[in-house]
Amino acid sequence: PRYSSSAASDVYKRQGQTTPGIPAFTWRYAAAFGSSVLRVQRADRNEMTSYWLKDGTRSEPIPVTGAPARSLLDVFSQYLVLGFTHILPFGLDHILFVLGLYLLSTRLEPLLVQVTAFTVAHSITLGLGLYGVIALPASIVEPLIAASIVYIAAENFLTDKLTPWRPYVVFGFGLLHGLGFAGVLHEIGLARSDFVNGLIAFNIGVDLAQIAVIAIAFLATGLWFRHRSWYRARIVHPALTVIGCAGAFWLVERII
């Protein structure tokens, strides 16, 4: 087939006509460029189909005509991985926010309360944002996400107790992070026929990544040192300083 192509930033577009008689095609992007998202739209269809291609792997055969046959399990596993990798390893701002929740206290109850509030909140706005019920530009959402990191780090310096307002604040920040997740999933693309399955899988992937972040942090620090008298001074406070400074940097960067 003859194609015209254009590249802008990290988006590469190709369009054209396929050679008659070819039932399907595959796509592969060089492994040196890392993982990529392939979005396919046919001229006779408004709906776009997305494929997650990890580290240069070749796509499955994509029919030239008609919708591709994809099982529920295929779609679920694809968006589960996308949700997980959006946090680990690519979502450093979300990782630092979750670490801020973890570093508040060595007790399990405050952590569970915060993580539950955050999870419920981002699940709500992820769905509503993807449905188009709520829409805020990234120029507003992204700076506010950075501000949430600064706030969590600053409050953790002041107390190691779960204040009465903390769950509500975390819930509010979770709503913002959910809009960020929705923006990412919207860019990736989600076919209408796969909407519910893909949305649930992506959200579960995000939650599993959050659990992984907390588990890694606990195994690296909490398991060994949380009962030490110097735990907050030598581990928590330096970590909060890094988290707060990173959040402040992103806040300025995203505003400018």
Question: Where are each of the predicted segments found?
Answer:
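Single conserved hydrophobic/aromatic residue that forms the stacking wall/gate
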Residues: P1-Y12
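Short, hydrophobic beta-strand segments
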Residues: R14-T19
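Short, surface-exposed ligand- or partner-binding patches at beta-edge/loop junctions that are enriched
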Residues: P20-V37
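Extended, hydrophilic extramembrane loops/domains of integral membrane proteins
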Residues: L38-D74
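Cytosolic-side membrane-insertion boundary helix
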Residues: P68-F90
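Hydrophobic alpha-helical transmembrane segments in multi-pass membrane proteins
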Residues: H86-I256
